[in-house]
Amino acid sequence: MMSIKKYFGTNVKFKPTIVIALISSFIFILDQLTKFFVVHILDLSGRLSITVISGFINFNMAWNEGINFGLFANSSEIMRIFLIIISILICMGIFFWAIKQNSILLLLFSSLIIGGALGNVVDRIIYGAVADFLNITCCGIYNPYSFNIADISIFFGVVGLIFSPNSKNQN
């Protein structure tokens, strides 16, 4: 059991496994709901592009068979299965590391990574690729890449773990 007294001034006790399960589940469900809405309700897979805020936010359908920025795309079925297994193993490693930490921040950041990674794993299982659809362009600079809620969650989780004051003392 951990306490959040140093963060919120209250001595509420909680189990790290429950915190990770709740936050990861929230991210996972949010990711899957947004993908379902965009792919199936808005039919982005058929329309390919929808302008949300002109010159800033677009929904551009991209099926990412690889990893970040499409690396290893167009690989074999074995590579897809390998990526699924590696993602699950990394999630398990992060989970078992995080539950040993005495920091709500490290639990939060770890949960963001786990929830996002599992969202992308489900895409690989269901669709054979990750459904990316968010595209942000700014100031006249064209951005060819699309991403999703899971990617955002993973990004902030990794950045949070790297820059968390609690992680500086960790190996």
For each predicted feature, which ranges?
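Alpha-helical transmembrane bundles and membrane-interface segments of multipass inner-membrane proteins
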Residues: M1-N171
